[in-house]
Amino acid sequence: MNVGILGIGRYVPEKVVTNHDLEKIMDTSDEWIRTRTGIAERRIADDTIDTSYMAVEASKKALEDAGISGEDIDLILVATVTPDRAFPAVACVIQEAIGAKHAAAMDLSAACAGFMYGMITAQQFIQTGTYKNVLVVGSDKLSKIVDWNDRNTAVLFGDGAGAIVMGAVSEGKGVLSFELGADGSGGKHLYQDEYVMMNGREVFKFAVRQLGDSCLRVLDKAGLTKEDVDFLVPHQANIRIMESARERLNLPQEKMSMTIEKFGNTSASSIPIAMVEELQNGRIQDGDLIILVGFGGGLTWGAVALRWGK
């Protein structure tokens, strides 16, 4: 059975916070942020919008895009590091909101790589015949766990949610290969106590090495080469990290998603948010070979070779 994406949706808050806005509250500048990260602005949720609200809104759009109802969903998986509370899970909030009365529901935590973990967990459940339709959501309100006095982290993050419905697709479409990985010895480089703490140099070295390597490995598993790749959707963390992955695949700039300028790093939601952007712009077409790749705290990573279409 081939498993792929039947529908996709996203939600981003309306409030835009630019680099110039941040100049007013911390020792930074638009030039400093842009040259180091590629970010110009980010969306920030106000106090009335929480992780589950964003997740529900993205889920509704994904269901509409898939042409199914909540009752057709068998499992809900939510990747998040900023749940509204320890329990109930964000997935359970979604279950009630969309009327998915037949669905099991749980959250999972793999930081910014969480969406990749959720996507492959869903694919495995469907491929084994356990479930037919699985809703996978990445949703994070990182603005509530960053120290707004720390310019090294506060400038990076934005809020948002992205969702996909996964199910059976036609032969040759969907997930062709994948890789999930973790290196717990690097957990000390990116973690949260009260606020997000990051050793930027070590995370950068890890990400540059791992993103390119994992892209090449999933291509090899699928019996494909980098010449076969039509489009790259990396986790939107840092422009220099993303460029390193693109260069490893020998792709021109127009074949890589670059939404970080508008949305910043939205953690588990960054890949589906970027995919919606590229679909709307017509840069992802039916039959395209797409590489999705992400990394996050843990340290964790994941990559998927995906043939777009149903």
UniProtKB/Swiss-Prot annotation:
Q: Which domain of life is it from?
A: Bacteria
Per the UniProt record, one Pfam family is ACP_syn_III
Task: Provide any one GO MF term from the record.
Answer: beta-ketoacyl-acyl-carrier-protein synthase III activity
Region feature (ACP-binding)? 236-240
Q: Which residues form the signal peptide?
A: none
Q: Does the keyword Ion transport apply?
A: no
Q: List the disulfide bonds.
A: none
E.C. no: 2.3.1.180
The family database entries (InterPro entries) matched by this protein are listed as: ACP_syn_III_C, ACP_syn_III_N, FabH, Thiolase-like
Q: Which GO terms describe its cellular component?
A: cytoplasm
Task: Spell out where the chain crosses the membrane.
Answer: none
Keyword Lipid metabolism belongs to the record: yes
Entry-linked SUPFAM superfamilies: Thiolase-like (SSF53901)
- Which keywords, in A-to-Z order, does the entry hold? Acyltransferase, Cytoplasm, Fatty acid biosynthesis, Fatty acid metabolism, Lipid biosynthesis, Lipid metabolism, Multifunctional enzyme, Transferase
Which cell locations does it reside in? Cytoplasm
Reaction equations catalysed: malonyl-[ACP] + acetyl-CoA + H(+) = 3-oxobutanoyl-[ACP] + CO2 + CoA
Record's CDD domains? KAS_III
Instruction: Write out the GO biological process terms.
Output: fatty acid biosynthetic process
Pathway linked to the protein:
Lipid metabolism; fatty acid biosynthesis
Annotated active site residues, numbered on this chain, are C112, H235, N265
Q: What task does this protein carry out?
A: Catalyzes the condensation reaction of fatty acid synthesis by the addition to an acyl acceptor of two carbons from malonyl-ACP. Catalyzes the first condensation reaction which initiates fatty acid synthesis and may therefore play a role in governing the total rate of fatty acid production. Possesses both acetoacetyl-ACP synthase and acetyl transacylase activities. Its substrate specificity determines the biosynthesis of branched-chain and/or straight-chain of fatty acids.
Its family remark reads: Belongs to the thiolase-like superfamily. FabH family.
PANTHER family, per database record: 3-OXOACYL-[ACYL-CARRIER-PROTEIN] SYNTHASE, BETA-KETOACYL-[ACYL-CARRIER-PROTEIN] SYNTHASE III, CHLOROPLASTIC
Subunit structure, interactors included: Homodimer.
Q: What is known of its domains?
A: The last Arg residue of the ACP-binding site is essential for the weak association between ACP/AcpP and FabH.
State what protein this is by name: Beta-ketoacyl-[acyl-carrier-protein] synthase III 1
Organism of provenance: Bacillus anthracis
